[in-house]
Amino acid sequence: MRNPTFGIIVWLGRLMRLPQLSYICIVMLRLKTLTILGSRAELASLPDGKLLINTVNAHSFNTAQKDSLFAEALQQGDVLIPDGVSIVKACKWIKAKSQPTERVAGWDLFAFEMDRLEHRAKELANAADAATGKLPLKVMFMGSSPKVLSLIEKRAAVDYPHLKVVTYSPPYKPEFTDEDNKAIIEAINSANPDLLWIGMTAPKQEKWTYAHWHELNIHCHVGTIGAVFDFYAGTVERAPLWWQEHGLEWAYRLMKEPRRMWRRYILGNVLFLWNMTKE
């Protein structure tokens, strides 16, 4: 006789329009064996050079169970940060290989990397650069809309005055053509940034970056940070500090955007718990 819990999960998978979750037989991604960054302090120990940094939370973990390329992208990236209290707690519960001590949000990664690059740029600045108006280091934002990127440029000019900001808005479509991909790659390689942010929402941003990683002739940290573009631009409000500190940022987003977020957080959290029972 079939376990009634299984029937509930099948129903949830169909309700979330994730039919593959109706057949929970093949596990694409295992939290127990993932290598995950332990804390915000460990960001300072990341090596220089070309480095792919992705994030994982309950939603992306669920999505990876039905998307083999996304699962591979998360596993094969250089650094995976725990962007969710659910990940931190689940790692303890299942006695995973990695035991992160705190949530490291995409915003934490963004703030750390931007501050570090600004500090380096300030040290490199000299009288000649100041006279010509040349900025020594460059950060690139690839993704989102021209409007959001324009707002990012304006804010970054104030927050990080020693950095040159370069942006590229790809076509807004579910999948890029070969011509689209070529144009994006050429834009990134031509810019040759000292820090690259990819913001096209998960799983698109992780899959695209992973698929084209060897075509990117750059030598810098690359972070896939999605919603941070909107947070930094101010087009989407981030949860107040109290909600963040108590691991309730997801609840705040659900409260602000219930129609868009209810599947992700209400049904998705149940599915995540079910996935943890299989670990």
What are these regions (language model features)?
Residues 15-18, 119:
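Compositionally biased, intrinsically disordered low-complexity segments enriched in Pro/Arg/Gln/His
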Residues 11-14, 126-127, 131-132:
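Short Gly/Ser/Thr- and charged-rich N-terminal loops/segments
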Residues 188, 192-197, 201-202, 209:
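Proline-aspartate-enriched helix->loop->beta-strand connector
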Residues 94-123, 133-187, 191:
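Conserved beta-alpha
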Residues 88-89, 238-279:
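A transmembrane-helix-recognition feature enriched in membrane-embedded lipid enzymes
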Residues 22-111:
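N-terminal nucleotide/polyanion-binding subdomain common to many enzyme families
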